[in-house]
C-alpha cells in the first residue's frame, strides 16, 4: 500500500507541474514519467482481473459497488431476477449489460499487449476471455444470439435483449483474436462457429419484414430499436457489413461475401453523412472505428479502401478533438466513487416498454472514466496515423491522475486498450 501511495503522490506532483507548464513534459525526466505510466497500467491490469472479472462466467462486469474484497460485484442480479427479466430485458442499470462490449475490447487489448511483450501467460488470459464470450454465445441455446452477460449465481441465466453494440465489439474482438498468434487452431474452429452463427442470425432476421431487427432471444423484436442492424443512423451503418465481412474472412464462404459486398457501399455512403458537429458519445467513435478497421483491412479495391481510410481519419479527428475536454472532466470527477445497488435507485425512468434504474451522480463518474479511455483509443486505431504530442501527453495524464485501486468503472479497460495500442505503435515506452 505504501508503494501505491508513493506512486499516487508522484503522479499528482507530475500532473501539477505539467499543468503549470501548459502540458510540456520537460519538467520531468521522460523515462521516469514513462515508468510511472507503465506502473499504473500494470496496476490497472491487476485490478481489472481481480475485481471486474469473474472466473465462474469468464466475463468482465460494468462497475463495482464496493472496494471490499469479495463484495465488489455484490450488486449483480440474482438468478431469480434475471429469469424474470428484472429490472428490464436488457439488464440496464444492473452492471451486467456490457459483457460483450468489454469482452471484445479485452480480446483486442490482449492481442496488442502480446504484440509488444510476447508474454506467454497472455495465451491463457485471452483464453479466459474467449470462454466467457463462448458462454454468452451458447448458454441460452439460441444460435447466433450474443447475450450481454451471464448471471454469476447460476452461470447460465441471461437477459434476452442484446444490441448491435454488443455484436459489434464481440465480432471485432473475435476477429482480431482469430488473426493473432495467440489463437490456436482449435480456438479458430470455435471462433468460426460463433461468428458464422452471428452472421447466419443476421441473414435470417435482418429483413424488411422484421424492420431489420436481429431480434431478441425470445424471437421478438426489440422495442427500443437497439438491435436494428440496417436503416439506422450513419454511425451505425457499417456494423452489418462488418459482421458479414468477418464471417466471410474466417470461413471463406461465399454466402457471407455476397451480403458483405451488397451492404458495403451503401454503408460507406451513409457513414459519410456523419458530421463533426454530431453530439456523439465517445463509445460511438470506438464502435465506428471497430467496424471500419475490419472493412478497411479486408478491402481489395484501392478506391473503396481509400474511402474507408478517409472515414477512419475523420473518426480519429472527431475523437481527438474531444480528448482534452474528457481529460479535464476526469480531473474534476470524484474518481474514487463506487456504484450503487441499483435496486435502491431513487429514480427509475421508462425507456419504451422497459423500466431502468438510474445511478444518480455515479453515472457521470462512470462515464467520464470510460470516455477518457475511449477517446484516447480511437485515433490510435487509424492505420498509419500521426499522433500529435498533445494526444500522447493527454493519455499519460489520464493514466497518471487515476488511482486504479480506487476505480469502480469498467472504463479502466479502455485506458488499458489505449495504452497498449500506443505501446504497440511505439508512441509510448515502458521507461
Which residues are covered by each model-predicted region?
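Bacterial N-terminal signal peptides that target proteins for export
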Residues: 2-13
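Bacterial N-terminal signal peptides
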Residues: 11-21
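Low-complexity, Ser/Thr/Pro/Gly-enriched N-terminal "stalk/linker" regions
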Residues: 28-98, 128, 132-149, 186-189, ...
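Terminal, non-catalytic domain-edge segments
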Residues: 29-54, 183-184, 294-431
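Extended, well-ordered alpha-helical scaffold segments
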Residues: 32-48, 120-136, 173, 182-206, ...
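Carbohydrate-binding/catalytic loop surfaces
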Residues: 59-93, 142-163, 211-232, 277-300, ...
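Aromatic- and glycine-enriched pocket-lining scaffold segments that form the walls
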Residues: 162-243
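Long, repeat-rich segments with strong aromatic
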Residues: 236-307
Amino acid at each position: 500500500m505504501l508503494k501505491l501511495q508513493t506512486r499516487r503522490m508522484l503522479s499528482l506532483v507530475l500532473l501539477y507541474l505539467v499543468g503549470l507548464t501548459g502540458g510540456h513534459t520537460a519538467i520531468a525526466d521522460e523515462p521516469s514519467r514513462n515508468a510511472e505510466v507503465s506502473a499504473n497500467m500494470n496496476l490497472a491490469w491487476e485490478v481489472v482481473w481481480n475485481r471486474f472479472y469473474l472466473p465462474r462466467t469468464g466475463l468482465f462486469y460494468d462497475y463495482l459497488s464496493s472496494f471490499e474484497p469479495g463484495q465488489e460485484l455484490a450488486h449483480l442480479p440474482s438468478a431469480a431476477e434475471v429469469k424474470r427479466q428484472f429490472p428490464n430485458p436488457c439488464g440496464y442499470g444492473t452492471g451486467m449489460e456490457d459483457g460483450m462490449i468489454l469482452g471484445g475490447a479485452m480480446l483486442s487489448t490482449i492481442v496488442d499487449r502480446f504484440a509488444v511483450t510476447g508474454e506467454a501467460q497472455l495465451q491463457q488470459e485471452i483464453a479466459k476471455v474467449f470462454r466467457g464470450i463462448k458462454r454468452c454465445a451458447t448458454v441460452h441455446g439460441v444460435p447466433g444470439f450474443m447475450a450481454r452477460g451471464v448471471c454469476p449465481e447460476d452461470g447460465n441465466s441471461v437477459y434476452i435483449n442484446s444490441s448491435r453494440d454488443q455484436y459489434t465489439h464481440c465480432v471485432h474482438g473475435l476477429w482480431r483474436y482469430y488473426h493473432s498468434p495467440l489463437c490456436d487452431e482449435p480456438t479458430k474452429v470455435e471462433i468460426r462457429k460463433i461468428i458464422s452463427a452471428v452472421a447466419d442470425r443476421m441473414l435470417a432476421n435482418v429483413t424488411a419484414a422484421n424492420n431489420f431487427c436481429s431480434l431478441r432471444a425470445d424471437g421478438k423484436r426489440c422495442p427500443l430499436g437497439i438491435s436494428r442492424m440496417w436503416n439506422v443512423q450513419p454511425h451505425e451503418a457499417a456494423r452489418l457489413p462488418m459482421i458479414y465481412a468477418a464471417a466471410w474472412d474466417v470461413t471463406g464462404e461465399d454466402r457471407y461475401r455476397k451480403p458483405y459486398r451488397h451492404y458495403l457501399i451503401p454503408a460507406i455512403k451513409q457513414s459519410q453523412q456523419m458530421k463533426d458537429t454530431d453530439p456523439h458519445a465517445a463509445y460511438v467513435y470506438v464502435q465506428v472505428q471497430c467496424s471500419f478497421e475490419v472493412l478497411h483491412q479486408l478491402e481489395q479495391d484501392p478506391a473503396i479502401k481509400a474511402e474507408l481510410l478517409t472515414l477512419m481519419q475523420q473518426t480519429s479527428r472527431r475523437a481527438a478533438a474531444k480528448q482534452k475536454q474528457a481529460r479535464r472532466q476526469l480531473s474534476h470527477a470524484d474518481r474514487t466513487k463506487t456504484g450503487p445497488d441499483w435496486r435502491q435507485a431513487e429514480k427509475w425512468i421508462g425507456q419504451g416498454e422497459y423500466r431502468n434504474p438510474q445511478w444518480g451522480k455515479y453515472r457521470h463518474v462512470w462515464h467520464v472514466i470510460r470516455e477518457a479511455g475511449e477517446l484516447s483509443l480511437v485515433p490510435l486505431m487509424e492505420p498509419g496515423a500521426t499522433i500529435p504530442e498533445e494526444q500522447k501527453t493527454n493519455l499519460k495524464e489520464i493514466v497518471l491522475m487515476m488511482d486504479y485501486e480506487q476505480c469502480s468503472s469498467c472504463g479502466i479497460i479502455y485506458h488499458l486498450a489505449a495504452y497498449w495500442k500506443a505501446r504497440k505503435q511505439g508512441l509510448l515506452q515502458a521507461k
